[in-house]
Amino acid sequence: MSTKEKLISHVMKEEPVGSRNKVTVVGVGMVGMASAISILIKDLGDELAMVDVMEDKLKGEVMDLQHGSLFLKTKIVGDKDYSVTANSKVVVVTAGARQQEGESRLNLVQRNVNIFKFIIPNIVKYSPNCILMVVSNPVDILTYVAWKLSGFPRHRVLGSGTNLDSARFRHLIGEKLHLHPSSCHAWIVGEHGDSSVPVWSGVNVAGVSLQNLNPQMGTEGDGENWKAIHKEVVDGAYEVIKLKGYTSWAIGMSVADLVESIIKNMHKVHPVSTLVQGMHGVKDEVFLSVPCVLGNSGLTDVIHMTLKAEEEKQVQKSAETLWGVQKELTL
């Protein structure tokens, strides 16, 4: 008799139940690992699967996390074979090529499309009913690519979009007003990154519209220069990259925030990337961030945001830029 047999007596033969709240993270780079640790610490899944083509890095990261299993409630698994991801509820894609110096955005996009052509069919094969969350950049275009390659209905494919941009925005407004970001309600919509659109008309604290108090808010003529806050949101990522080489923690927390709303069926509203064709005057098949309701079925509803004509025009301009890139892609 083995030590185990002397210690434990079976009452019944256990049938594998399978995981109900399994989350997969594809890519164990800085963003993938920050997402993984955020998901683990928030206790969101009963199993976390990690997958990457770089076998040694993957093995090392998984072992490192597993060594902390005593302090967690989530089973951690990892393999370069996608079978490890089977039956996931949510799959978070953070993998992708890094932009090289002097590389055009279109070239980077096409390289990432080629990577997605391998990743997405593997996800679909093992988790045909999952909710697919794209984090890799440029996130709006790659969410469109993932949607096309997966064949999933649009409510099961979303991009992390401007969830982080809006968090940065609320943090900076909070700093200026000496308030906690959760008390500063503000939204950034449109494209994640340089051409994102701050909805100044919607910025409020306790229901008090800041634009009612300062009608010039967000414009060139504003003596308080609130416009600089949006510039800081856009430049924030570049600043962090310049200082530490990459961004990771805030995007990781942002991903966990979205995963939580899905797994816990919270029906919480987040600015995430979804198909916006037919909204705000957008004619093409593009994905941009608008306020969306997230729950157990995925992205169930879109909130009709009241945008000013100028804001709407910016969204349309973003859409045209994205479509210009998308129509050149070979899927």
Curated annotation (Swiss-Prot):
Protein location: Cytoplasm
Record's catalysed reaction(s): (S)-lactate + NAD(+) = pyruvate + NADH + H(+)
Record's keyword terms, sorted: Cytoplasm, NAD, Oxidoreductase
Gene Ontology cellular-component annotations: cytoplasm
Broad enzyme group: oxidoreductase
EC number, UniProt record: 1.1.1.27
Residues annotated for NAD(+) binding in this entry: 29-57, 98, 137
Biological or metabolic pathway of the protein: Fermentation; pyruvate fermentation to lactate; (S)-lactate from pyruvate: step 1/1
Active site per UniProt: H192 (proton acceptor)
Gene Ontology terms for molecular function: L-lactate dehydrogenase activity
Binding positions (substrate): R105, N137, R168, T247
BP terms from Gene Ontology: lactate metabolic process
PROSITE patterns reported in the protein's UniProt record: L_LDH
InterPro entries (alphabetical): L-lactate/malate_DH, L-lactate_DH, L-lactate_DH_AS, Lactate/malate_DH_C, Lactate/malate_DH_N, Lactate_DH/Glyco_Ohase_4_C, NAD(P)-bd_dom_sf
Database matches in HAMAP family: Lactate_dehydrog
Functional summary from the UniProt entry: Interconverts simultaneously and stereospecifically pyruvate and lactate with concomitant interconversion of NADH and NAD(+).
Protein family membership: Belongs to the LDH/MDH superfamily. LDH family.
Subunit structure: Homotetramer.
Designated name of the protein: L-lactate dehydrogenase A chain
Native source species: Harpagifer antarcticus
Gene: ldha
